[in-house]
């Protein structure tokens, strides 16, 4: 497989999942066509464009999916189009239909962004130069990451956050789409009424997006993570500069937040064992932090520095 052009399947533990996305035989080595099929259907469509369309067209729900038609797909809010792609959405259980992550934008942000791309490209040589810069930002923070990561199927969580930079770039094009609409009306010397209607339409887009996404992004009165970290820190001994060992992100971030932001128990030393195998983290732990001394590590830097 590694000798073929542009191999994308590399993890033998994911062989069954690869086959599910590429349509290959269960006990056969993947072909060039199957590699490209996997790249297009999973890595591009499912793990990038699906996230992109969540943000600018609409989202079915916030249930993590594995390709099934009822979980985590993009939708438009236009019934006949969504039903054509995913089946009759009215047949979904209420728990999915009323999911807070069910957000519909009717594709309006996408259309404005495409208009912005067209407007920028048609503004002469300078517009094309500006487009190339913005497109490079869009590509390198989106599709280039897809190419580099070469992800296996069955990721432990949705990965849309990895491509936020490209979504920001497209949001710039959305703004240009509004400018393009104004420029078009200015050139046609449109009357005040059409201009006003167009501005209301453009204003409707962010209002619709905010109204749809507010309930699933509202963090009001959510203190579980904060309280979790504070409780851990406050139960440690008051004296002696205690050390708390933790493992992984969810164990660690509530502790860091409480110390760094709310200044809770800054005499406690937090040690994340997931990082303990790295030279930079060992050095950090040897240094004092806030009111806590460094960890009593007797090695000097030459003994654990990578490459020495």
PLM region descriptions:
Residues 1-163, 170-241, 246, 252-308:
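ER/secretory pathway lumenal C-terminal domains and tails of membrane proteins involved
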């Amino acid at each position: 497989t590694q000798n073929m052009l542009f191999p994308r399947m590399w993890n033998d533990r994911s062989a069954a999942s690869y086959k599910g996305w590429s349509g290959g035989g269960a006990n056969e080595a993947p072909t060039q066509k199957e590699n490209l099929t996997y790249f297009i259907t999973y890595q591009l469509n499912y793990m990038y464009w699906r996230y992109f369309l969540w943000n600018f067209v609409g989202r079915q729900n916030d249930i993590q999916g594995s390709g099934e038609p009822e979980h985590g797909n993009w939708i438009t809010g236009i019934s006949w189009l969504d039903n054509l792609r995913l089946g009759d959405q009215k047949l979904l259980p209420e728990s999915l239909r009323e999911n807070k992550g069910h957000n519909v934008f009717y594709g309006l942000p996408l259309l404005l962004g495409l208009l912005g791309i067209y407007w920028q490209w048609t503004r002469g040589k300078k517009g094309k130069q500006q487009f190339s810069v913005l497109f490079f930002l869009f590509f390198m923070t989106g599709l280039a990451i897809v190419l580099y990561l070469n992800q296996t199927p069955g990721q432990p969580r949705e990965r849309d956050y990895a491509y936020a930079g490209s979504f920001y770039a497209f949001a710039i094009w959305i703004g240009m789409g509004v400018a393009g609409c104004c420029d078009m009306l200015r050139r046609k010397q449109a009357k005040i009424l059409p201009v006003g209607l167009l501005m209301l339409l453009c204003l409707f887009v962010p209002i619709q997006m905010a109204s749809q996404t507010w309930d699933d992004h509202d963090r009001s009165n959510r203190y579980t993570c904060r309280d979790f970290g504070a409780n851990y820190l406050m139960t440690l001994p008051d004296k002696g500069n205690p050390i708390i060992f933790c493992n992984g992100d969810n164990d660690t971030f509530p502790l860091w937040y409480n110390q760094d932001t709310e200044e809770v128990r800054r005499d406690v030393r937090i040690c994340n064992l997931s990082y303990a195998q790295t030279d930079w983290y060992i050095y950090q732990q040897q240094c004092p932090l806030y009111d806590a001394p460094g960890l009593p590590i007797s090695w000097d830097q030459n003994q654990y520095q990578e490459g020495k």
